[in-house]
Amino acid sequence: MRLLFVLLLSSVVASADRPNVVLVMADDQGWGQTGYYNHPVLKTPHLDAMAAAGLRFDRFYAGGPVCSPTRATVLTGRSHDRTGVFDHGFALRSQEKTLARALQRAGYATGHFGKWHLNGLRGPGVPILKDDTHSPGKVGFDVWLSVTNFFERDPLLSRM
């Protein structure tokens, strides 16, 4: 009887739909910089709607002082001194074990959309192509629509 229960339970678990996994990451956003935390200036209607439905971003911590080390830390679970991504301009090594690769092994389709900033120094807004040696595809993303970085190093363009 116990074996039958285990078999039935495993078949139910195997047939259950897997949850979608979406990681939202914003550069240089403080914990109180959302509408649902009553920021006096910033408007975040989509985040506010998710918070009203029960999803609040209140347990996420940066792995480094700037975006590239933090991105590497999030993707690998390792500190930036272990990934070798110490600052802007350092590429994530393709041999790193990443969250994207783990999700692929579990049968998920993976994608990256937005700022990558883990492929070394490139000009702002440069698209990341399939043959880039440090593309999202090299660390476990099936598809991506990503650019190297945005205009944070140009005082004029960063305001546009």
Question: What is each model feature region?
Answer:
Residues 3-13:
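Sec-dependent N-terminal signal peptides
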